[in-house]
């Protein structure tokens, strides 16, 4: 096994074709990390000109110290049962990490627990410290240890039927409601950033500046690995649909009124049907007024939601999503998710990753809502083998990875106690 010098294109081709490859190991992903102070080095190993393993090493300087952290996000990309290739990758990583004064090499392979026995054993044998099997969104990890994934290598009906029953009904309703899902361009990021700000204010989290999303789009879109989707509501088109539905409801009422006059047996049923239709008419009249007001203010329509869809070979990722507070009954997110899954499948993906989650958290958990949303899309829990550290500077590692977090937790506890007094 020997070190190899390969191009960025060869590196990406290997990552995209390998079962353990991941978006975070693509060379263009490293470009997106520059804004936050990371820089990259890449390594490859193989035999007789054939690549057998690669890794993208991200480095970031430790504040106020002449040291760095080496982070191989979702790497190494290698067959973990191939001890020779794994050992060669570690040797190459150590050589570069030491030159960059890294205190540790941190990895979190895209390898699931039920397939990771070799990986776990072989990494430990090489001297890696395993950080345990904690909850998926544990703050002790950089990347989530658990994600929710939908298999999308099936036709439209099979895909829809893989969703939970209630969610399936919502998707069907969303398709009828009259929104349009657009694959947008870079200009659409302005709208997306505005929707993200609204989402952050509603759900209570800090949002990224538009430059962050532009950075991702610019780096990965050219290779087809980043797409922006937006969902639009056209008031004129939907006013016409509401008028049609109102006409149908009035016709239905007339039909049941006639039955009431001709059949006493059906009188009770007819009255129930009339009441139901009248309730629907009231709701549609309210909706029509809202749409007419929207048409006056925004005759061209408004965007209700958006998302970034990412790719790495046969894997697709729902990376960021945002939505408006208006017209939520139109279920724009449901329309968008189903459309993005189909788009991903049509462009070679077999899986659709919803991102991080815990495993069946309690209802009072801060992560319950996230899990509840992701579980209804025909997903399975992808539990990874977790995070590993290869220590290069033990005193500094202990200070940064162990002592400092304890001090931070202690400060938080003291602060909370003082606030209670």
UniProtKB/Swiss-Prot annotation:
GO terms for biological process: cell wall organization; peptidoglycan biosynthetic process; regulation of cell shape; response to antibiotic. InterPro entries: Acyl_CoA_acyltransferase, FEMABX, PG_Glycine_Bridge_Synth. It comes from the Bacteria. Its EC number is 2.3.2.16. It is found in: Cytoplasm. SUPFAM superfamilies: Acyl-CoA N-acyltransferases (Nat). Keywords: Acyltransferase, Antibiotic resistance, Cell shape, Cell wall biogenesis/degradation, Cytoplasm, Peptidoglycan synthesis, Transferase. GO terms for cellular component: cytoplasm. Pfam families: FemAB. It catalyses: beta-D-GlcNAc-(1->4)-Mur2Ac(oyl-L-Ala-D-isoglutaminyl-L-Lys-D-Ala-D-Ala)-di-trans,octa-cis-undecaprenyl diphosphate + glycyl-tRNA(Gly) = beta-D-GlcNAc-(1->4)-Mur2Ac(oyl-L-Ala-D-isoglutaminyl-L-Lys-(N(6)-Gly)-D-Ala-D-Ala)-di-trans,octa-cis-undecaprenyl diphosphate + tRNA(Gly) + H(+). GO terms for molecular function: aminoacyltransferase activity. The keyword Cytoplasm applies. Disulfide bonds: none annotated. Catalyzes the incorporation of the first glycine of the pentaglycine interpeptide bridge, which is characteristic of the S.aureus peptidoglycan. This glycine is added to the epsilon-amino group of the L-lysine of the membrane-bound lipid II intermediate (GlcNAc-(beta-1,4)-N-acetylmuramic acid(-L-Ala-D-iGln-L-Lys-D-Ala-D-Ala)-pyrophosphoryl-undecaprenol), using glycyl-tRNA(Gly) as donor, in a ribosome-independent mechanism. Involved in methicillin resistance. Monomer. PANTHER family: LIPID II:GLYCINE GLYCYLTRANSFERASE. This is Lipid II:glycine glycyltransferase. It comes from Staphylococcus aureus (strain MW2). The gene is femX.
């Amino acid at each position: 096994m020997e070190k190899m010098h390969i191009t960025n294109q060869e590196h990406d081709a290997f990552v995209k074709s390998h079962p353990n490859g991941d978006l975070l190991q693509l060379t263009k992903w490293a470009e997106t990390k520059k804004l936050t102070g990371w820089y990259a080095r890449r390594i490859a190993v193989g035999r007789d000109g054939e690549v057998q393993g690669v890794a993208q090493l991200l480095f970031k300087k430790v504040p106020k110290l002449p040291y760095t952290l080496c982070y191989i996000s979702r790497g190494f990309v290698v067959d973990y049962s191939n001890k020779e290739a794994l050992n060669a990758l570690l040797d190459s990583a150590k050589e570069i990490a030491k030159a960059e004064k890294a205190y540790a090499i941190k990895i979190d392979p895209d390898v699931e627990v039920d397939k990771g026995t070799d990986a776990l054993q072989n990494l430990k044998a090489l001297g890696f410290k395993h950080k345990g099997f904690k909850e998926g969104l544990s703050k002790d990890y950089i990347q989530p240890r658990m994600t929710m994934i939908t298999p999308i290598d099936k036709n439209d009906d099979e895909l829809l039927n893989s969703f939970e029953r209630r969610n399936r009904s919502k998707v069907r309703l969303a398709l009828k409601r009259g929104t349009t899902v657009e694959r947008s361009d870079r200009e659409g990021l302005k709208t997306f950033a505005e929707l993200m700000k609204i989402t952050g204010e509603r759900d209570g989290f800090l949002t990224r500046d538009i430059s962050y999303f532009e950075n991702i789009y610019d780096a990965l879109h050219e290779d087809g690995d980043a797409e922006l989707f937006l969902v639009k509501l056209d008031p004129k088109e939907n006013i016409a649909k509401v008028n049609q539905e109102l006409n149908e409801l009035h016709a239905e009422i007339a039909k049941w009124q006639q039955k009431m006059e001709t059949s006493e047996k059906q009188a009770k049923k007819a009255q129930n049907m009339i009441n139901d239709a009248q309730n629907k008419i009231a709701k549609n009249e309210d909706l029509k007024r809202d749409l007419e007001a929207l048409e006056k203010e925004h005759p061209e329509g408004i965007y209700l939601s958006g998302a970034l869809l990412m790719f790495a070979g046969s894997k697709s990722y729902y990376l960021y999503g945002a939505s408006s507070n208006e017209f939520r009954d139109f279920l724009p997110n449901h329309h968008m998710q189903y459309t993005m899954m189909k788009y991903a499948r049509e462009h070679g993906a077999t899986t659709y990753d919803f991102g991080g989650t815990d495993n069946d958290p309690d209802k009072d958990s801060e992560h319950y809502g996230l899990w509840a949303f992701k579980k209804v899309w025909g997903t399975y829990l992808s539990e990874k083998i977790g995070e590993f550290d290869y220590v290069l500077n033990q005193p500094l590692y202990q200070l940064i990875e162990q002592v400092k977090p304890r001090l931070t937790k202690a400060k938080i506890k003291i602060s909370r106690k003082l606030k209670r007094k």
